Amino acid sequence: MYIGKFHKYAVAGICLVGMQNDHAAHIVKVASDALIKKGFKVMIFNAFTDMFYDTPYSKGEASVYHLINLDIIDVLVIMPETIKSEWVTDTIIRYANAAKIPIIMLDGSHNGCTNITYDYGRSLETVVEHVITEHKCTDLFFMAGTKGNCFSEERI
């Protein structure tokens, strides 16, 4: 809760990577609008490079998440699929848990957090069914994504 000289309001933080990309920007816009309608002010903590490769550059970018003033944050939304590093995501969660801040995982799952996940398997099934029944295609090829990625495996 931010308490200033003239104002008092709830604050939500959103942690992600790649807000400069249309898809991530759209998700942040929808989430921010929903939080604002509930009376929150929204702070966005964004890095430009995902943390998949553990490089000095990505470590430097990950330091943006250390700037979160947990004294004024009332809820933290984390988008782990954009961050692409369990270590970075776990570090953010550990700091938020220590400050007793509720965490919403958007498109991810973690113990002790409120998890919002997408049904990637069912959505692909619906698209394939549509292509077969409506467009009469019978000889289909598709790529599910990166081998070993849980969402890619779910599509298969």
Report the location of each language-model feature.
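A short, compositionally biased domain-edge/stem linker segment
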Residues: 1-4
